[in-house]
Amino acid sequence: MVSANGDLHLPISNEQCMPENNGSLGFEAPTPRQILRVTLNLKYLIDKVVPIVYDPNDIVCDHSEILSPKVVKLAYEACGGNPKDKANKRKYQSVIIFSLLKVCEWYSILATMEVHNAKLYETRNLASQQLCKLLIEREETRDLQFLFMQLLLRRYVINENDEDQEPLNALELATDMHCTTVIGSSGFQRCLKWIWRGWIVQNGLDPTTFIKDDSLAEVSLISHFNPVRLKAPVYQNYLQMIFSFLFLGLYTLVVNGKDSERVQSFDLLESIFYVFNTGFILDELTKLYYIGYAHLSFWNLFNDTTYLIITFAMGFRAMSVTPLNAKYSSEDWDKISYRVLSCAAPFVWSRLLLYLESQRFIGIMLVILKHMMKESIVFFFLLFLIMIGFTQGFLGLDSADGKRDITGPILGNLTITVLGLGSFDVFEEFAPPYAAILYYGYYFIVSVILLNILIALYSTAYQKVIDNADDEYMALMSQKTLRYIRAPDEDVYVSPLNLIEVFMTPIFRILPPKRAKDLSYTVMTIVYSPFLLLISVKETREARRIKYNRMKRLNDDANEYDTPWDLTDGYLDDDDGLFSDNRNSGMRATQLKNSRSLKLQRTAEQEDVHFKVPKKWYKNVKKCSPSFEQYDNDDTEDDAGEDKDEVKELTKKVENLTAVITDLLEKLDIKDKKE
C-alpha cells in the first residue's frame, strides 16, 4: 500500500491483498524470468567480487573491504529498473534478498558437484549471505515496511530449467537452507518477532500473502477477544505447552494410580488421557496428509513413537475390560497394558523439550543434541559393518563342525561389548585360538577405536554449536515460527481440541461456507474463552503503547523497555485501567513523566555553571573515534537526496506537535488536580 508521501506500508485488510488489488501492495511482483535474470546478475557480481578463497573473517567482519559499499550499490543496480522512477526501481529491488538466497542455494549445489572447488563455493555462499545481511540491516533503517512486506515476506516464483518453481519468500528460503548469517540479522529477527507475536498475519483470503493485524492499536477488550488471534505462533505455543503439561499430569495419574489387583473399568482421568492421545495422533496424521514426507523429522518420529506405545497400551487395556474369550485372562491383559504404558514414561517427559525450546538454554541444548545425533550416524554405520563382519566370522567358526552350538551367546556378547560389558569367558573353550583372536580384535576396534571416534564426533558437534550458539538458536526459533504459519488449518483447534473439529466436520459440510465459518468462530470463542480473556488483557495494554508510538511517529515495537540512558523512552501502562473510560491516561502520564525527567535533569545540570561539558568536547570525541565515512555514506544517493528535505520537514513537524501536546497535557493535568 502506498501512502501519500510515497512510502510503502503493510496492507491491513484482506481485501487489499486480493489479485485485483495488487496495486495496493505497492507494485506487482517481477515475473519468474525477470527474477531469474536478477539472480544471474547477482551471481555474476559475487563471482567477480570473490574470485579466490578468502578468510571468512575478512568477509563477515564489520566494514569489510570485500563487501564494500560499492558492492552493495552494485547489488542494487543488478536488479535493474528505472533509476528515475522510485516505484519501478523498488519493484525489481524487492527480489534482491530472495535472489541472493537462490544464489546461495546454487553455490551449495556447486560445492557438492565440484568437490575440488568446494572451498571457493563455500566462501561465495558466505559472501552471498553476508551481503543479504548488509542489505537487510540497511533497509531496516530506511524503510521497515518495505523490508517486511516486499523483501522478506512476499512470495516470489523463479524460473529454473524452463520451469516455474513453487512460490517461496526469503524468510522461508533462509530458514529451509539454514542460512544462519541471514537469520541472525537484526531486520530478519525483527520480522520474525512481529510474526511470532501475531502483529503480521497471513491473509484470510489468500494464505500466501501477509497483512498487518488491523486490531493492533485497538484499545478495547472486545476487539482483541477474537479466536483469530490464536493464529499467532506465540499463543499456539502457549496452548501446546498447557496441553502438554496436562497430558503429562494425566499420564502420571494413570500410570501410577493403579492400587488394586482387580481389573477396573476406565475411569474419568484414564478416558481423558486416551482422548488426548487420540487427538495427538489425529493431528500427526492430518499434518502428514497435507505436508507429506517433509513433515517427518526427529521430533515428529519421537512423538509418533510415544503415541504408538500409548495406543498399544490402550488396546491391551480395552482387551482387559472387554468380555471376550481370549488366550489370556483379563488380569493378564490389564497387567500387560500398564507395563507397556510404563515404558512410555521417558518419551512423555522428554517431549516437553519440544515445547520449551523457545527458552534459549533449552533451545541450544536441543540443537546440540540434534547435531550429535547426526554425527552419531557415522559411528553406527561403522559399528554395523564391523559387527556384521565379526558376527559372520564367529558363526562360521560355530558351524565349522557341521552344527551350531553357541550362536545365541555369541550374538549377545558381541552386542553388550558395545556397552563395555563384554566377556572373554564365552570364547575360552570355543574354537581355540581362532575365536579368541577374533574377539580380541573386535573388542579393540569397538572399545578403543570406534568409541573414541564417537567421543570425538560428539565433541566436534558440541563445539560447532557452542561457537555459533546465538545464530543456531535464532535458526531454531525461525523453524519453530514457520511450523505454525505453515500449518494447513485456517481455524486453530490445538490438539486434542481438534477432535471437536472432526466431530463437527459433517455439520460444516452441510452448512453454507459463511454459516459454517460463523459456527466454527462461535465454537472456538466458547472453547478458548478463558485463554482469549487473558489475550485480550495483554493485547489491550500493548495496544495503548502502540497507539502512543504511532502518535509519536515511531515503530510499533518502540518503547517496550524503559532504559536508564534514554529519559524519553518507555511507557507507563500502569496508569491505564482496563475498564477505564479515559483511554489516554497512560499516554498523558508518559508525556508528563518524560517532560518531568528532562526538566529535573536539566535543572540538576544547571546548578553548577562549571558542570556543563563544552561543545568542544563532543567535537574531540568525534575526532578520536575511528573514521568510517566511506562506509557510512548512503550509496543510494538519489534516494537520500529525495528523502533528506522530507525528513527534515517531518522532524520539525513532529517536534512542534510534541511541544504542543506536552503543553496541553500539562494544562489538563493541572485542571484535573484543581477539580
From Swiss-Prot:
The chain crosses the membrane at residues 237-257, 296-316, 336-355, 377-397, 406-426, 437-457. It holds the Pfam family LHD_TRPY1. InterPro entries: LHD_YVC1, TRP_calcium_channel, YVC1_C. Present with 1310 molecules/cell in log phase SD medium. One of its GO terms (molecular function) is calcium channel activity. It is found in: Vacuole membrane. The modification Phosphothreonine is found at residue 636. One of its GO terms (cellular component) is plasma membrane. GO terms for biological process: calcium ion import across plasma membrane; calcium ion transmembrane import into cytosol; intracellular monoatomic cation homeostasis. This is Calcium channel YVC1. PANTHER family: NONSELECTIVE CATION CHANNEL PROTEIN. Required for release of calcium ions from the vacuole in response to hyperosmotic shock. It comes from the Eukaryota. It is a multi-pass membrane protein. Residues 1-236, 317-335, 398-405, 458-675 are cytoplasmic. Residues 258-295, 356-376, 427-436 are vacuolar. Belongs to the transient receptor (TC 1.A.4) family. Its main location: membrane. The keyword Membrane applies. Keywords: Calcium, Calcium channel, Calcium transport, Ion channel, Ion transport, Membrane, Phosphoprotein, Transmembrane, Transmembrane helix, Transport, Vacuole.
